[in-house]
Amino acid sequence: IRDRFRADGEKVFKERNTFLALEGNFGRLFAGTHDTAFKVAQLKVDLFNDTRADIKYLFQGENRMNSFVAYTTPELIDGLKVTINSISQSTGTFESYSVNYSTGSIKLAFALDSNGKGYDSTRFTTMFPIESLGIDVGLMYQSSEKISTGVSENGHLLSLKKKVSDKGSVYLQTASSDIKLESGKQNSIGYDYKISKIAKVFFHYSDLESDKTSKNAEYVSVGFEYK
């Protein structure tokens, strides 16, 4: 369980995945409550996950589902794995697929959601370092079609993270998407200071803007995270 406390005193409670798994040379079969293959294909490019700057406010597909059955292949070639999800829901079967490739410090993912909470979505993600600058880069592009209307929208994200000391890191993130908010844009900056391997303090600032002015907001978070 992860606990977060924001500066306004509100506690944000987040459950972890809860599932049973069978794993061997054949791959990994698991069932229960789990992040979808589509969500996992985000590759943690969202540096503000589980905060008010989470990309779920702009992008469809950040889902953790119940009634979940999934299979991940063993490595088909070095660094390449495929994950298949089947989730039962009231509107029919929700299927989620991903292809993930990792080599050294470079990661790539391609994912599809079919009938995922009323959307069909495609996502491309990559993470890689710029070693000469000491910066980790995250990039994501997504297209989502609302099944009931046939309207398709897209969005993209760029995140940058750099260590500024042995224990401190600064990070920036910018995202633009029409999927959940028309002309939605979110810019965020954060700083983490590690107290230990399992604890850190953090500061976040985020600005969300869109054509729907009632959703526009600025957020400041100061907190402590223990894993």
Locations of regions flagged by a protein language model:
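Outer-membrane beta-barrel and related beta-rich outer-membrane complex signature
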Residues: 41-45, 151, 215-217
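Outer-membrane beta-barrel "beta-signal"
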Residues: 69, 193-197, 216-227
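Residues that define the transmembrane beta-barrel architecture of outer-membrane proteins
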Residues: 13-16, 63-67, 76, 91-95, ...
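Short loop/turn motifs that connect adjacent beta-strands in outer-membrane beta-barrel proteins
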Residues: 26, 76-79, 130-134, 166-167, ...
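Membrane-embedded beta-strands of outer-membrane beta-barrel proteins
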Residues: 18-20, 69-71, 82, 97-99, ...
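Detector for outer-membrane/organellar transmembrane beta-barrel domains
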Residues: 94-188, 193-194
